[in-house]
UniProtKB/Swiss-Prot annotation:
UniProt entry tagged with the keyword DNA repair: yes
Any GO MF annotation of the entry: single-stranded DNA binding
Keyword tags: DNA damage, DNA recombination, DNA repair, DNA replication, DNA-binding
HAMAP family in the cross-refs: SSB
Name this protein carries in UniProt: Single-stranded DNA-binding protein
Gene source species: Ralstonia nicotianae (strain ATCC BAA-1114 / GMI1000)
Cellular component terms per the entry's GO annotation: nucleoid
Residue interval(s) of motif Important for interaction with partner proteins: 173-178
Gene: ssb
Length: 178
């Protein structure tokens, strides 16, 4: 029987992203995202909140985008998979489970995010397109949030914004009120 390793998180960053580069030149960005569960305490009848913190790792072009546009407090949607790392420290085995991001959508208003595409609608993925050079060479696209394996056989390389059809509203700068 097939198995599934899929995680979807919507939450807020607890700190600015930390980006570093591997010897190969590929970017790695780590973030911590808080999600809050609200529930009614059965004993007291009071509303309670429980916050969970999630470590998320981005790789390649997606890491560069996350490092550039996400900031502390930013709301973000992330799809990915769980990965557990193991190492030894002082003779003791240590474990850490994190989310390896495959797709990211920046949420919230443009005022809370820096730069173009920071508002709702900044969807990016690892973009493993055929002909795109493999892991880090795919195209990151703004707008709809491309999922893994999509994107056709276009040229790999840098990120490009997907051009939306012209509808005569290019000059409108207002945020949508809902």
């Amino acid at each position: 029987m097939a198995s599934v390793n899929k995680v979807i998180i919507v939450g807020n960053l607890g700190a600015d992203p930390e980006t570093r580069y591997m010897p190969s030149g590929d970017a790695v960005t780590n973030i911590r995202v808080a999600t809050t569960d609200r529930y009614k305490d059965k004993a007291s009848g009071e509303m309670r909140e429980a916050t969970e913190w999630h470590r998320i790792a981005f790789f390649g072009r997606l890491a560069e985008i996350a490092g550039e546009y996400l900031k502390k407090g930013s709301q973000v949607y992330v799809e990915g998979r769980l990965k557990t790392r193991q190492w030894e420290k002082d003779g003791q085995k240590q474990y850490s489970t994190e989310i390896v991001a495959e797709q990211m959508q920046m949420l919230g208003s443009r005022q809370g995010m820096g730069g173009e595409g920071g508002g709702g609608g900044g969807g990016y993925s690892r973009g493993e397109s055929s002909g795109g050079g493999g892991y880090g060479g795919g195209r990151a696209q703004g707008g709809g949030g491309m999922s893994r394996g999509e994107g056709g056989g276009g040229q790999g390389g840098g990120a490009r914004r997907q051009q939306a059809p012209s509808n005569g509203f290019e000059d409108m700068d207002d945020d949508i009120p809902f």
